[in-house]
């Protein structure tokens, strides 16, 4: 049976400042930790990325032509406050006013994120969100944006608090490149969630119009053998690290006893302790019912197997299938069933995981109000032929994920939109430019845009709300 989506459903495309804008030092923009980190550790930089800083009118015109009626944009904190605090950079403010005006001119609703992996260098080198001073700096930055950009109707505090802690302190592929420090992972998650809560409360108390929420990456975790209690436990612990800890903070305003039992076990095995304060929980509790929406970024699921050994994580950054490894002491290791498809970057393709995650939020956090799928898409080594890309694999991936969203809506979940990652090809943090996701192919030499086959398919779905 052909599935459909509601008439008012948003068919969006997603971007992020550092991955799309380029212009990393233009018009007074301050440095971010990624600038030097990429220079020192990788074979690419974010200059000029997709040159969105200059070419946003082209991308928004294409959006309008191809039925994309929502766009995720992030504000680069260091364009507004070059050092994260202090003097405001008027050119940065002007740029975003112009960008949002163009969005509205093209009837593409901007969903605006305040922080998408790009803390200003001056604050990042001072401990980033492990330093509690950063909470105050973030709230001040948020307040300025809420006041200044009243034309924005949808705000998101953070993009992917989970992968930030994970990338910075567990896998070590994000600056500062620390590995296997689980106490830092949880502390980073916690302090960022407190920052989120404080910003949401300020937004509501100040009476700003519009809506506010947060975007969490929520990869679904399954036991490799559902009949083996040790595998079930491994999946539960892995879920706490990546999902439950931050979801509890968002919607319970505290960490459930079961969550804290898991956290304490992980820290007992791996070392370290957390600094969780009374005022933190007061802030979390005050915001737990104020989130207007939850953004879910979903790309993949994982299967977990019990494992007794040392932590070892190998990141597959070059698309060499089968080269990744993930095992955490006291938690478990990832081991996928052989029949589940994977991308070249070892990302597991499992649309059912998105359905299960949406229904989990609905069941476990009934005070959620609505959900947007704020990122979902397929990273590919696209072949550019005849001025396009015949990306049938991407179409199939998106189609299957839209179908399970339709199922979730039928089963009572309030899902209001979908943002494909990414609108156009962008720079990928730890994979460079080979891993493409866009609806529009970008020739990074000339910065020309070319609609892929998926763009024409997406346009038809957006126009008809019929998934076929």
Swiss-Prot record:
<feature type="active site" description="Nucleophile">
    <location>
        <position position="375"/>
    </location>
</feature>
<dbReference type="InterPro" id="IPR033132">
    <property type="entry name" value="Glyco_hydro_1_N_CS"/>
</dbReference>
<keyword id="KW-0378">Hydrolase</keyword>
<comment type="similarity">
    <text>Belongs to the glycosyl hydrolase 1 family.</text>
</comment>
<feature type="binding site">
    <location>
        <position position="437"/>
    </location>
    <ligand>
        <name>D-galactose 6-phosphate</name>
    </ligand>
</feature>
<dbReference type="InterPro" id="IPR018120">
    <property type="entry name" value="Glyco_hydro_1_AS"/>
</dbReference>
<protein>
    <recommendedName>
        <fullName>6-phospho-beta-galactosidase</fullName>
        <ecNumber>3.2.1.85</ecNumber>
    </recommendedName>
</protein>
<feature type="binding site">
    <location>
        <position position="429"/>
    </location>
    <ligand>
        <name>D-galactose 6-phosphate</name>
    </ligand>
</feature>
<dbReference type="Pfam" id="PF00232">
    <property type="entry name" value="Glyco_hydro_1"/>
</dbReference>
<feature type="binding site">
    <location>
        <position position="159"/>
    </location>
    <ligand>
        <name>D-galactose 6-phosphate</name>
    </ligand>
</feature>
<dbReference type="GO" id="GO:0008422">
    <property type="term" value="F:beta-glucosidase activity"/>
</dbReference>
<dbReference type="GO" id="GO:0033920">
    <property type="term" value="F:6-phospho-beta-galactosidase activity"/>
</dbReference>
<feature type="binding site">
    <location>
        <position position="435"/>
    </location>
    <ligand>
        <name>D-galactose 6-phosphate</name>
    </ligand>
</feature>
<dbReference type="InterPro" id="IPR001360">
    <property type="entry name" value="Glyco_hydro_1"/>
</dbReference>
<dbReference type="InterPro" id="IPR005928">
    <property type="entry name" value="6P-beta-galactosidase"/>
</dbReference>
<feature type="binding site">
    <location>
        <position position="428"/>
    </location>
    <ligand>
        <name>D-galactose 6-phosphate</name>
    </ligand>
</feature>
<feature type="binding site">
    <location>
        <position position="297"/>
    </location>
    <ligand>
        <name>D-galactose 6-phosphate</name>
    </ligand>
</feature>
<comment type="pathway">
    <text>Carbohydrate metabolism; lactose degradation; D-galactose 6-phosphate and beta-D-glucose from lactose 6-phosphate: step 1/1.</text>
</comment>
<feature type="binding site">
    <location>
        <position position="160"/>
    </location>
    <ligand>
        <name>D-galactose 6-phosphate</name>
    </ligand>
</feature>
<feature type="binding site">
    <location>
        <position position="116"/>
    </location>
    <ligand>
        <name>D-galactose 6-phosphate</name>
    </ligand>
</feature>
<dbReference type="InterPro" id="IPR017853">
    <property type="entry name" value="Glycoside_hydrolase_SF"/>
</dbReference>
<keyword id="KW-0326">Glycosidase</keyword>
<dbReference type="GO" id="GO:0019512">
    <property type="term" value="P:lactose catabolic process via tagatose-6-phosphate"/>
</dbReference>
<feature type="binding site">
    <location>
        <position position="19"/>
    </location>
    <ligand>
        <name>D-galactose 6-phosphate</name>
    </ligand>
</feature>
<dbReference type="GO" id="GO:0005829">
    <property type="term" value="C:cytosol"/>
</dbReference>
<feature type="active site" description="Proton donor">
    <location>
        <position position="160"/>
    </location>
</feature>
């Amino acid at each position: 049976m052909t599935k459909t989506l509601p008439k008012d459903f948003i068919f969006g495309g997603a971007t992020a400042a550092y991955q799309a804008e380029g212009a990393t030092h233009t018009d007074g923009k301050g440095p971010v930790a990624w600038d030097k980190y990429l220079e020192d550790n990788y074979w690419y930089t974010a200059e000029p990325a997709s040159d969105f800083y200059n070419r946003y009118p082209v991308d928004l015109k294409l959006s309008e032509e191809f039925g994309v009626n929502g766009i995720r944009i992030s504000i680069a904190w260091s364009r507004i406050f070059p050092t994260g605090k202090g003097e405001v950079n008027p050119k940065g403010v002007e740029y975003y006013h112009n960008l949002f005006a163009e969005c509205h001119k093209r009837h593409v609703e901007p969903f605006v994120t305040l922080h998408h992996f790009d803390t200003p260098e001056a604050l990042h080198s001072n401990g980033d969100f492990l330093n509690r001073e950063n909470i105050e700096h973030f709230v001040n930055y948020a307040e300025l944006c809420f006041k200044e950009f009243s034309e924005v109707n949808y705000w998101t505090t953070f993009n992917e608090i989970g992968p930030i802690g994970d990338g910075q302190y567990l896998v070590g592929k994000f600056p500062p490149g620390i590995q296997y420090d689980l106490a830092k992972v949880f502390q980073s998650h916690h302090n960022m969630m407190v920052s989120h809560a404080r910003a949401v409360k300020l937004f509501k108390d100040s009476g700003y119009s519009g809506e506010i929420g947060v975007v969490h990456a929520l990869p679904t975790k399954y036991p490799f053998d559902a009949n083996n209690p040790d595998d079930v436990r491994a999946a539960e612990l892995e879920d706490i690290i990546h999902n439950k800890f931050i979801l509890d903070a968002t919607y319970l305003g505290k960490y459930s006893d079961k969550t804290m039992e898991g956290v304490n076990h992980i820290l007992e095995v791996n070392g370290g302790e957390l600094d969780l304060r009374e005022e933190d929980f007061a802030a979390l509790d005050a915001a737990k019912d104020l989130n207007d929406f939850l953004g879910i970024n979903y790309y993949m699921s994982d299967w977990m197997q019990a494992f007794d050994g040392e932590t070892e994580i190998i990141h597959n950054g070059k698309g060499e299938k089968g080269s990744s490894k993930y095992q955490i002491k006291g938690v478990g290791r990832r081991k996928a069933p052989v029949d589940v498809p994977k991308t070249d970057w070892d990302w597991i393709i499992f649309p059912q995981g998105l359905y299960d995650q949406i229904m989990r939020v609905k069941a476990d956090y009934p005070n959620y109000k609505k959900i947007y799928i704020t990122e979902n898409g397929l990273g590919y080594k696209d072949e550019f032929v005849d001025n396009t890309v015949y990306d049938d694999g991407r179409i199939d991936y998106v189609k299957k994920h839209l179908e399970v969203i339709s199922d979730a809506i039928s089963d009572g979940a309030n899902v209001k939109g979908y943002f494909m990652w990414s609108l156009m090809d962008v720079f990928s943090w730890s994979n460079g430019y080979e891993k493409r996701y866009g609806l529009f192919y970008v020739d990074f030499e000339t910065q020309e845009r070319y609609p892929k086959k998926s763009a024409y398919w997406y346009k038809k779905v957006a126009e008809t709300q019929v998934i076929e």
